[in-house]
Amino acid sequence: MAASATATVGTKGIVRQVIGPVLDVEFPAGKLPSILNALRIEGKNPAGQDVALTAEVQQLLGDHRVRAVAMSGTDGLVRGMEALDTGAPISVPVGEATLGRIFNVLGEPVDEQGDLKNVTTSPIHRSAPSLTDLETKPKVFETGIKVIDLLAPYRQGGKVGLFGGAGVGKTVLIQELINNIAKEHGGVSVFGGVGERTREGNDLYEEFKESGVINSEDLTKSKVALCFGQMNEPPGARMRVGLSALTMAEHFRDVNKQDVLLFIDNIFRFVQAGSEVSALLGRMPSAVGYQPTLGTDVGELQERITSTLEGSITSIQAVYVPADDLTDPAPATTFAHLDATTVLARALAAKGIYPAVDPLDSTSTMLQPSVVGDEHYRTARAVQSTLQRYKELQDIIAILGLDELSEEDRKTVDRARKIEKFLSQPFFVAEIFTGMSGKYVKLEDTIKGFNMILSGELDQLPEQAFYLVGSIDEVKAKAEKLASEAKA
């Protein structure tokens, strides 16, 4: 593996060709760097401009040349400049020193808080844990979000996909999860911003400072490290920043023996960057223009995200779905690695149901009686069958109206509408837009609430009382308030 390739450390090559973010470098015979080695180019070009960039070797071309992909812009780079072989892959800082800080793909701080002192570094390319080191006993990870905990529970040390098109609330849901995990579980999180908007990254950082997830006074008390390679970065940076974030998370798991949360927003941008790099390297594209190595690229990242006997990395990955098409190769390949999927539906967002998690499309391998228990399993399945029946009846209601339904079906529709409303929930991170305080709902309260709706105990309460509340006690309080307002 490239991590051990130190024989060529310090060898100097000459840049022979630059095409956008891809450069060809010629080295002395017998001194070629290994694939994945980092090359460092520093100096002044003939125009007197300072040039400083790192590139990663991707191909050995023959004629003593290698082809590398730059991790930053190649502006000012000219043929004839010297490139130094570092003899190892890109390495990033790891450990407590990373908490509360923002890094780029190379592990350089970009938050204007100064350089890191006496920090341990680790290469971003490494093998997945061996089979004998893996933890195989399933354990549910409580998030405090009703629709997730009840219908598509997350596995501790598992991989979760957040699927949805543009603007249906993936990033807000990720922010809420980081907030809940930090406050309720005292967990450490690593956030990998892969190819998303710079503004969102800045907003996220400011929100973390406001909520105390990042402690501005004492960074060591922060609960999250951030690693960003945003939309404006070259494809090389967007392709590798996910690995940089993962490397930081692995250190907390393997060395500190902690349970870690790794957020990747957005895993589709990782695939998209790989596709751009693949085309620049001259590889033949496969279906829909994606790279021929799509399965391998995704697999190398995903297989490192796992639970070991020492600790766990639970990963929550936002997956942008191009044109809302779940059969697109990028989301379809990602599906194969996931333990749970949280699918966000535009139709629910249009109705004002937030989080807009689709209760029928979202799935989890954890939702089985042997893992979650009989009561949880029965409640979840009853909720889904009620919602499914409501979905089937919608055409009849649209054509003939509610009055044409049987008494039993009318009851089902009434309860389904209450369930749909009760699956909404105010978020802590959305307080600024909604003016409503966020709610963290314990799993037992969630199960109790839905059982009461299904049993008919709450049939007399108005539908609106179930909208944007936490537990069932809040529903009752809201119903009383609505009744008193109606009288007034």
UniProtKB/Swiss-Prot annotation:
Keywords: ATP synthesis, ATP-binding, CF(1), Hydrogen ion transport, Ion transport, Membrane, Nucleotide-binding, Thylakoid, Translocase, Transport. GO terms for molecular function: ATP binding; ATP hydrolysis activity; proton-transporting ATP synthase activity, rotational mechanism. The keyword Kinase does not apply. InterPro entries: AAA+_ATPase, ATP-synt_VA_C, ATP_synth_F1_bsu, ATPase_a/bsu_AS, ATPase_alpha/beta_chains, ATPase_F1/V1/A1_a/bsu_N, ATPase_F1/V1/A1_a/bsu_N_sf, ATPase_F1/V1/A1_a/bsu_nucl-bd. Gene3D superfamilies: 2.40.10.170, Bovine Mitochondrial F1-atpase, Atp Synthase Beta Chain, Chain D, domain 3 (1.10.1140.10), P-loop containing nucleotide triphosphate hydrolases (3.40.50.300). It is found in: Cellular thylakoid membrane. GO terms for cellular component: plasma membrane-derived thylakoid membrane; proton-transporting ATP synthase complex. It comes from the Bacteria. It is a peripheral membrane protein. ATP binds at G164, G165, A166, G167, V168, G169, K170, T171. Signal peptide: none annotated. PROSITE patterns: ATPASE_ALPHA_BETA. Its main location: membrane. It is an enzyme of class 7 (translocase). It holds the Pfam family ATP-synt_ab. It catalyses: ATP + H2O + 4 H(+)(in) = ADP + phosphate + 5 H(+)(out). Its EC number is 7.1.2.2. Produces ATP from ADP in the presence of a proton gradient across the membrane. The catalytic sites are hosted primarily by the beta subunits. NCBIfam families: atpD (TIGR01039). Belongs to the ATPase alpha/beta chains family. F-type ATPases have 2 components, CF(1) - the catalytic core - and CF(0) - the membrane proton channel. CF(1) has five subunits: alpha(3), beta(3), gamma(1), delta(1), epsilon(1). CF(0) has four main subunits: a(1), b(1), b'(1) and c(9-12). This is ATP synthase subunit beta. It comes from Prochlorococcus marinus (strain NATL1A). The gene is atpD.
